[in-house]
Amino acid sequence: MFETLINNISKSIVGNKEKIKLALAAIISEGSILIEDNPGSGKTTLAKTITLNLGLNFKRVQFTSDLLPSDILGFNILQNDKLTFQKGPIFTNIVLADELNRGSPKSQSAFLEAMEEKNAVSYTHLTLPTKALV
């Protein structure tokens, strides 16, 4: 089954079986991975293809200097005299953080904390979905 999955993903990602195996190992172990590579090398395609093959959800966060922690984690909205939490993109199975080094220290810290602790803090602790790969 594992080899079939690798072969299916390899149809979209040519020549990167080692990256595919490492990414799948991270998903199985509910860990995280850091892929540093040149632009256009297929990092986003790899994440999307794995997501499709496993039937998971995918979100992408583009880190910029003006990105706020609430843009990643979510925020409270006042609706009908009641605070409702609007979940951010971190609340998905696979999150691709693009240009993480360009984010502000607060945004990086919020993202890395959620990644490590598998929860986000917004007045209460909210648990991230299982099989969350960041």
Regions found by a protein language model. Name each.
Residues F2-S32, N38:
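Pre-Walker A (pre-P-loop) alpha-helix and adjacent loop at the N terminus of AAA/AAA+ ATPase modules
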Residues G15, A23, I35, I72, ...:
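Conserved RecA-like P-loop NTPase ATPase core
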Residues K21, I28-E30, L54, P89-T92, ...:
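Short loop/turn elements that form and flank the Walker-type P-loop nucleotide-binding site
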Residues I28-F63:
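Walker A/P-loop
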Residues N57-L78:
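AAA+/P-loop NTPase substrate/partner-engagement loops
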Residues L78-V95:
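Conserved alpha-helical scaffold flanking the Walker A/P-loop in AAA+ ATPase domains
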Residues T92-E116:
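Conserved AAA+/SF3 P-loop NTPase catalytic/coupling segment centered on the Walker-B
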Residues T124-T130:
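Conserved small/polar residues in nucleotide/adenosyl-binding loops
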